[in-house]
Amino acid sequence: MGSGWSSEEEERQPLLGPGLGPAPGAARRGREATAVLPAAGPNPGRVYGRRWLVLLLFSLLAFAQGLVWNTWGPIQNSARQAYGFSGWDIALLVLWGPIGFLPCFAFMWLLDKRGLRVTVLLTSFLMVLGTGLRCIPVSDLALKKRLIHGGQILNGLAGPTVMNAAPFLSTTWFSADERATATAIASMLSYLGGACAFLVGPLVVPAPNGTAPLLAAESSRAHIKDRIETVLYAEFGVVCLIFSATLAYFPPRPPLPPSVAAASQRLSYRRSFCRLLSNLRFLMIALAYAIPLGVFAGWSGVLDLILTPVHVSQVDAGWIGFWSIVGGCVVGIAMARFADFIRGMLKLILLLLFSGATLSSTWFTLTCLNSITHLPLTTVTLYASCILLGVFLNSSVPIFFELFVETVYPVPEGITCGVVTFLSNMFMGVLLFFVTFYHTELSWFNWCLPGSCLLSLLLILCFRESYDRLYLDVVVSV
């Protein structure tokens, strides 16, 4: 393990040399950002090759958390037959994800006070417990269902770290011209894990045959249960490997900071919340992120339920969900790399992405109402509209994260992103709560997509961007 910046107190102390400051006449935000500069210490700016290993381990953890969270939605028909799950159970299994964000602020405090290593180890340990709980062999179906729900709750508690810590990791380990890319990779891998659940589940677990005779149905139920347990054991093994790797090597931070922003002093936990809640610009852009991304996350979790009324099979629904998220991950990383090369364009990128998201979500919603709109309802149109929607929305996540941090700097990255992901999961949880009661007819859920995307587009248009952290790295360090 690399040597750390030795103590908690030292972590919050200035590390930059004297004489660094903004030119006379700089804007007020530039002066506020520069006020957090240290008074003495070595000049930072070194990056280490091990940063990619740290990013890989964190990304694999995020991938596994997304995979475990989305285990049940893509195989909901099979789970109903194997374990006697109801539509309420399936919605609740997905709902444990946003419920796991309720102690989000405790994880933000831990990340701010104890750093990456302690927080990541606790997160991975919770995932080991959760996936292990689902694998306990019991014959009582009622007890098995409780164990599965308990495992999903523990995995949901890992969500705050994998969703919030990406900008913190990128600032801690990466230089200014790599931060957006690192944030995109770390944050997108959780979505990619959820996408792989759409692929792995339906391919490994067979769909039930509702027309089979009674004896054949019992045999099919046992076979489906065995295949589901195979998936559960495989996920448990993957999580254990990742936990072992992070336990063996996951340094809290590099010996020297990679940039001026990484070395600068940050606001305290209490002052950070006061700054966030009093910043109207931050609240505006936070809602622009939380509402559509929360709606889309909940919609993706029950995509199979939504597509069943239009006669889309479990396997086809899985492929649609898979490619929509994979496309968003690829485009998101590409957009972040573009943002690293051409700085100060985050708002424009978001406007383009949400214009596309509004159009594609409207197309999908109207297509599902083909009896009224007479639009062609084919596999091609469903694939195209869902994939485009996933590409536009998922690829906006790392761009939003970078804009949040720039807007409220010097608030710590973990606290900033923790607040917005908490809001996103709150909206997701509210929608999934309604799904547990109104799961027989979900056309209303489809209309939430274009409405939330349009609202977000209007909020982004009214938002006035600023780049306080970038000012430190590009101007002050010159």
Curated annotation (Swiss-Prot):
Reactions mediated catalytically: pyridoxine(out) + n H(+)(out) = pyridoxine(in) + n H(+)(in)
Question: Which keywords accompany this UniProt record?
Answer: Glycoprotein, Lysosome, Membrane, Transmembrane, Transmembrane helix, Transport
The residues on the Lumenal side of the membrane are 73-89, 139-152, 206-229, 303-314, 369-384, 436-442
Residues assigned to the Cytoplasmic compartment are: 1-51, 111-117, 174-184, 251-281, 336-347, 406-414, 464-478
Q: Which domain of life is it from?
A: Eukaryota
Residues that carry a glycan = N209
In the record, the note on similarity to other proteins reads: Belongs to the major facilitator superfamily.
* GO terms for cellular component: lysosomal membrane
**Location(s), subcellular:** Lysosome membrane
Keyword Protein transport annotated = no
For this entry, the protein name equals Solute carrier family 49 member 4
Q: Which InterPro entries match?
A: FLVCR1-2_SLC49-like, MFS_trans_sf, SLC49A4-like
**GO process terms (BP):** pyridoxine transport
CDD domains per UniProt: MFS_DIRC2
State what this protein does: Mediates H(+)-dependent pyridoxine transport.
Q: How does it sit in the membrane?
A: Multi-pass membrane protein
UniProt region (Disordered), positions on chain: 1-27
Task: Give residue numbers for sequence motif Di-leucine motif.
Answer: 15-16
Tell me, in one coarse class, where this protein mainly resides.
membrane
**Reported modifications of this chain:** Cleaved in lysosomes by cathepsin L between Leu-214 and Ala-261, generating a N-glycosylated N-terminal and a non-glycosylated C-terminal fragment.
Per the UniProt record, which residue ranges are transmembrane?
A: 52-72, 90-110, 118-138, 153-173, 185-205, 230-250, 282-302, 315-335, 348-368, 385-405, 415-435, 443-463
